[in-house]
């Protein structure tokens, strides 16, 4: 009798269930395992199959007690009827709103006032835009008096009753339009005189491209405080009124500060006069950009810290430095950081794009390329303002005549050791022979000599400044009689006292301890003439 074959027992202990994750793939080439070589299922397939078998938990009646793979349902909730949640948080009546509106308009006219909590203030209710202002027609004429059976108006009200009044209104609107567009008005006057330059080299349009203006508007939009850097030698010539108008109309919440850079190139009384004049419009500070020996750094840092403290609701504030080319915007940022973080050069156009600089954890600085606003400046004015690189000028000698007219003769004698000259050509010829700028055959190189003079002008080696419009007691008297040699010591002591008084005024206003000054502005009778008004 044959033995009954017993069923083999799995003694290896390996699982054989199809949903077991630890199942071994013994059959090679069968099935679709993860490695492609086993008959079992992968762990991802096993988890997916288990998910299909999950069911919600129900009671005997079939009501779902607990959903599988879902969060537990919360019971119905009800918000407490408390005044803290449903009541008015801020209530103001019409009289208080009108009073606050008048106070706000009177205070905001002063640029030294700052709104502390702008987000909590309903500015949309306090400022009536001209386009959104109501006409208040029912206050002037009720609806019943204009339409219906009780209407009293027999004919419609027109803009003008006769042609004379219509013509007058058209003239008034035309005059208002011309006043608004002052640049177009100046160009029109030039056309009437017949002295308008129709063709101008592209180098005289530097700083006016769309890319540069785009960089300026990006800096303005990103800044909480805008610092307009001005040249202390000619503040009004390097001032951009278009920028100030843009901030007043479109960005009233941004703050504008004037910074008089290069104050070491002008006498102390002129700096004090310009501070007094410009401070009537915006906060103004005097500054001398230098990493080692600067002036006004403490005052500017103090102002920036005050703005950061006022903007306590923001994590950090951004300060944008804008202005004409070659006024020292990048040098000011390097002075604040006490190291070279921005590229600087004594030529315009070194900064190409805007640049973010970290000053502190809460203050960031933005360097902007120089922007030139289109105005009525001639080519010579553009060159003398430092907008154009002198090396790119084809004929630099044609701009020397204006330099000789703006600078006193004594300053040119002291700078170039030339006693007398007839005109600008004679001046260049003598200077070429003195400095050795000669061509073949001993001919003077007028172009190279003229470029050298313009370089000295832009870098401050030739003393020049525009006096302030209202000169105070510290300014030197222009009508003083010539002094004899025996009174030189008394005059020197008087001028020394006046200069020390002006310096003390600037120090007290800006809380500084030392003032850098140019060596040429001394106290002797010969050197003191530099501090007088330039012709």
Swiss-Prot record:
| Residue span(s) of domain CP-type G | 213-374
rRNA processing is among the record's keywords: no
Region G3, annotated ranges: 367-370
What are the start and end residues of every segment in region (G4)? 261-264
Quaternary state and interactors: Interacts (via N-terminus) with the 60S ribosomal proteins RPL10A. This interaction is enhanced by the addition of GTP.
Tell me which family the UniProt entry assigns to this protein: Belongs to the TRAFAC class YlqF/YawG GTPase family. RsgA subfamily.
What's the protein called, per UniProt?
A: Nuclear/nucleolar GTPase 2
């Amino acid at each position: 009798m044959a033995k009954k074959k017993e069923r083999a027992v799995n003694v290896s202990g390996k699982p054989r269930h199809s949903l077991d994750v630890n199942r071994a793939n013994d059959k090679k080439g069968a099935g679709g395992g993860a490695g492609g070589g086993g008959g079992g299922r992968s762990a991802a397939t096993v988890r997916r199959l288990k998910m299909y078998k999950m069911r919600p938990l129900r009671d005997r009646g079939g009501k779902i007690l607990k959903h599988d793979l879902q969060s537990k349902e919360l019971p119905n909730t009800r918000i407490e009827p408390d005044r803290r949640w449903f009541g008015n948080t801020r209530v103001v009546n019409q009289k208080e709103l009108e009073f606050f509106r008048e106070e706000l308009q009177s205070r905001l006219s002063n640029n030294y006032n700052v709104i502390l909590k702008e987000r909590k203030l309903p500015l949309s209710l306090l400022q009536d835009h001209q386009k959104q202002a109501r006409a208040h027609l029912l206050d002037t004429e009720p609806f019943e008096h204009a339409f219906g059976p009780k209407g009293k108006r027999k004919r419609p009200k027109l803009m003008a009753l006769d042609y004379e009044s219509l013509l007058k209104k058209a003239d008034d609107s035309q005059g208002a339009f011309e006043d608004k567009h002052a640049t177009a008005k100046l160009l029109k006057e030039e056309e009437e005189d017949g002295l308008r330059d129709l063709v101008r080299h592209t180098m005289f349009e530097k700083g006016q491209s769309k890319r540069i203006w785009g960089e300026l508007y990006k800096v303005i939009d990103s800044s909480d405080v805008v610092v307009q850097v001005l040249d202390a030698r000619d503040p009004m010539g390097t001032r951009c009124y278009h920028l100030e108008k843009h901030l007043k109309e479109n960005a009233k919440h941004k703050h504008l500060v004037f910074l008089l850079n290069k104050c070491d190139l002008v006498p102390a009384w002129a700096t004090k006069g310009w501070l007094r004049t410009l401070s009537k419009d915006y906060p103004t500070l005097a500054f001398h950009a230098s990493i080692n020996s600067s002036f006004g750094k403490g005052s500017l840092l103090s102002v920036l810290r005050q703005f950061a403290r006022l903007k306590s609701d923001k994590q950090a504030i951004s300060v944008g430095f804008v202005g004409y080319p070659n006024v020292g915007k990048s040098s000011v940022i390097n002075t604040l950081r006490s190291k070279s973080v921005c590229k600087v050069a004594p030529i315009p156009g070194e900064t190409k794009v805007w640049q973010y600089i970290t000053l502190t954890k809460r203050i960031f600085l933005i360097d902007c390329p120089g922007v030139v606003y289109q105005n009525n400046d001639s080519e010579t004015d553009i060159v003398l303002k430092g907008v154009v690189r002198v090396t790119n000028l084809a004929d630099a000698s044609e701009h020397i005549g204006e330099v000789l007219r703006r600078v006193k003769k004594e300053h040119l004698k002291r700078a170039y050791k030339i006693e007398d000259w007839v005109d600008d050509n004679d001046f260049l010829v003598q200077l070429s022979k003195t400095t050795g700028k000669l061509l073949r055959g001993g001919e003077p190189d007028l172009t190279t000599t003229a470029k050298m003079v313009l370089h000295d002008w832009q870098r401050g080696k030739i003393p020049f400044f525009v006096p302030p419009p209202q000169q105070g007691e510290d300014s030197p008297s222009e009508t003083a009689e010539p002094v004899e040699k025996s009174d030189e010591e008394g005059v020197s002591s008087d001028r020394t006292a006046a200069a020390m008084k002006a310096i003390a005024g600037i120090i007290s206003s800006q809380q500084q301890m030392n003032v850098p000054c140019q060596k040429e502005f001394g106290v002797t009778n010969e050197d003191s003439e530099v501090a007088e008004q330039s012709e």
